[in-house]
């Protein structure tokens, strides 16, 4: 528990903070003034009604000084969740916080470390061990490689119009303490940018970094054990985000179910750009690896939604329409536009509805078939034929596409009377792999590397 003082919305408060909840205690002489002004509605002279209108914090950031450490603590507030008051104590919703030695420090660098990163950028490739077993003297030499050879080339992406550089490296920590190992290595992902005091920008970088690791691990329950802020003068402090605790899973990491940095080298910036713009579909990812093995109506529909989104980014449906079809659609649209102008009331509405249906769109089944045509031979068939053979189901592109389309429609339209298509369960498992392949192709990763990634993430253990 930390205590201290801070100012908010024109008043000075004593605060308590337990790393999750920020509670503010006003001065005794201002307690009633704040309570009635913020949490009651005035309906007459000296007459107030409770509750009043919702009250929200106005500042993006609050700056306090902790009594226990004499350091400045900066809180990033949640301006969309209302303040709560109980017996004069005000609870302020916060998103994140960090400590620093100075007020309003500038930030130009954020470093992320964590369990998943140690696998994505393997730490076991950053050192060598040498010893002479024949001498039996117990001497073992551990030598780390230099910084240049353990740091990747910088890539660039943009956030809110600002350029950010990203690279991977390895942090070395030595200790003479009994409680700690003499040498600790940990992989880090570093974002470097122009100095800023906009800590909302820093939090946005956190979102982007986390979603990037979620994409690489193909699941949502990833975490960072250490997030360090620094600037041109040196270290600033550790960045802490307030969020629900997650289940830590070792099995998918031990099984190799993640994308190593070496497979996407040179493309990190493009992937991060997509995440920054919120264009990379990740809603279909399971909350955990265990959760992703459970297929229900919701996860089925989300995977098909992911497919359709990625399909729209890779392909234009006009490419596969004949010129004659395009001409006829244009003529029909013009004729219906003439009828709309010359009609009124319900008839006009009918013509408008008809115009919307003139332009034909590919069905989900057609899109899946087209994707097989594009990537079947070069990428997908190697894994699909193995997977379906393993489950004693015929591997047929058109049948897979038709089953997924029908079952998705049954779920989406609430057709409870329709019998579940059993084979579609395997189809949607394979569809998850198709989606990842499409995403990798969109980023420009070549077919060989894409197959290596699919082979690793989904544990096929095939020769590719």
Protein language model regions, located:
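Extended aliphatic helical segments
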Residues: 34, 47, 57, 72-73, ...
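Amphipathic, oligomerization/interface secondary-structure segments
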Residues: 247-464
